[in-house]
């Protein structure tokens, strides 16, 4: 969807290690409009963006116990928009004083032959889905509210059905490593969304 924001830190002999700080929750369909109204009041004074994306998750199995995972995403409603390749590292859950999940994040725009390239590299597609929703911004924070649709016929994004009767809500910041104070701002913002949605530091391993 989005490339990491540009930082003002000088790059000296290498790339900046970017981290994603994340809080997650969900709302039932009937609460969506109330949440959208609240976010319009709390977020930056600009019209929220809408998105309709097709995401494919690729795995590469090797010597390690768990496969290497890459995510390829393209916009379905913006002609000519580049594909995006995303890598998300293992979450750092240990620090109880940190109010958000933290994981390494690499997000780059690519050419449209991305999926062919991944297959040539030995990756295989594990699953795919369509995500449709709204994107809000509050300073460097990003809030996405979206519904996931399963693809009924592999590769056919016109044949989908909703995965659940709820919308996922994600509050995130992409920043250089060591900027843990952003999790305090995220927690304060999340408090303002209660009781409509409870955004939490969720360990993905608990969902498996």
From Swiss-Prot:
<keyword id="KW-0010">Activator</keyword>
<dbReference type="GO" id="GO:0005654">
    <property type="term" value="C:nucleoplasm"/>
</dbReference>
<dbReference type="GO" id="GO:0016592">
    <property type="term" value="C:mediator complex"/>
</dbReference>
<dbReference type="GO" id="GO:0032968">
    <property type="term" value="P:positive regulation of transcription elongation by RNA polymerase II"/>
</dbReference>
<dbReference type="GO" id="GO:0051123">
    <property type="term" value="P:RNA polymerase II preinitiation complex assembly"/>
</dbReference>
<feature type="modified residue" description="Phosphoserine">
    <location>
        <position position="66"/>
    </location>
</feature>
<dbReference type="InterPro" id="IPR019095">
    <property type="entry name" value="Mediator_Med18"/>
</dbReference>
<keyword id="KW-0804">Transcription</keyword>
<comment type="subunit">
    <text>Component of the Mediator complex, which is composed of MED1, MED4, MED6, MED7, MED8, MED9, MED10, MED11, MED12, MED13, MED13L, MED14, MED15, MED16, MED17, MED18, MED19, MED20, MED21, MED22, MED23, MED24, MED25, MED26, MED27, MED29, MED30, MED31, CCNC, CDK8 and CDC2L6/CDK11. The MED12, MED13, CCNC and CDK8 subunits form a distinct module termed the CDK8 module. Mediator containing the CDK8 module is less active than Mediator lacking this module in supporting transcriptional activation.</text>
</comment>
<comment type="function">
    <text>Component of the Mediator complex, a coactivator involved in the regulated transcription of nearly all RNA polymerase II-dependent genes. Mediator functions as a bridge to convey information from gene-specific regulatory proteins to the basal RNA polymerase II transcription machinery. Mediator is recruited to promoters by direct interactions with regulatory proteins and serves as a scaffold for the assembly of a functional preinitiation complex with RNA polymerase II and the general transcription factors.</text>
</comment>
<dbReference type="GO" id="GO:0060261">
    <property type="term" value="P:positive regulation of transcription initiation by RNA polymerase II"/>
</dbReference>
<dbReference type="Pfam" id="PF09637">
    <property type="entry name" value="Med18"/>
</dbReference>
<comment type="similarity">
    <text>Belongs to the Mediator complex subunit 18 family.</text>
</comment>
<dbReference type="GO" id="GO:0003712">
    <property type="term" value="F:transcription coregulator activity"/>
</dbReference>
<protein>
    <recommendedName>
        <fullName>Mediator of RNA polymerase II transcription subunit 18</fullName>
    </recommendedName>
</protein>
<keyword id="KW-0539">Nucleus</keyword>
<dbReference type="GO" id="GO:0070847">
    <property type="term" value="C:core mediator complex"/>
</dbReference>
<keyword id="KW-0597">Phosphoprotein</keyword>
<keyword id="KW-0805">Transcription regulation</keyword>
<dbReference type="GO" id="GO:0005634">
    <property type="term" value="C:nucleus"/>
</dbReference>
């Amino acid at each position: 969807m989005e490339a990491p924001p540009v930082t003002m830190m000088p790059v000296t002999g290498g790339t900046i290690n970017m981290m994603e700080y994340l809080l997650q929750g969900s709302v039932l369909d009937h609460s969506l409009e109330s949440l959208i109204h609240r976010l319009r009041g709390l977020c930056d004074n600009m019209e929220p963006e809408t998105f309709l994306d097709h995401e494919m998750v690729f795995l590469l199995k090797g010597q390690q116990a768990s496969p290497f995972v890459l995510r390829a995403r393209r916009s379905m409603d913006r002609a000519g928009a580049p594909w995006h390749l995303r890598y998300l590292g293992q979450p750092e859950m240990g620090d109880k004083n940190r109010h958000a999940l933290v994981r390494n994040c690499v997000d780059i725009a690519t050419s449209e032959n991305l999926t062919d390239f991944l297959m040539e590299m030995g990756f295989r597609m594990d699953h795919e889905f369509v995500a449709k929703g709204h994107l809000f911004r509050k300073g460097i924070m990003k809030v996405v509210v979206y519904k996931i649709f399963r693809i009924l016929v592999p590769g056919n994004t016109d044949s989908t059905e909703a995965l659940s009767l709820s919308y996922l809500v994600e509050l995130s910041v992409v920043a250089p490593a060591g900027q843990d104070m952003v999790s305090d701002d995220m927690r304060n913002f999340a408090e303002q969304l209660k009781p409509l949605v409870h955004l939490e530091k969720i360990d993905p391993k608990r969902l498996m």
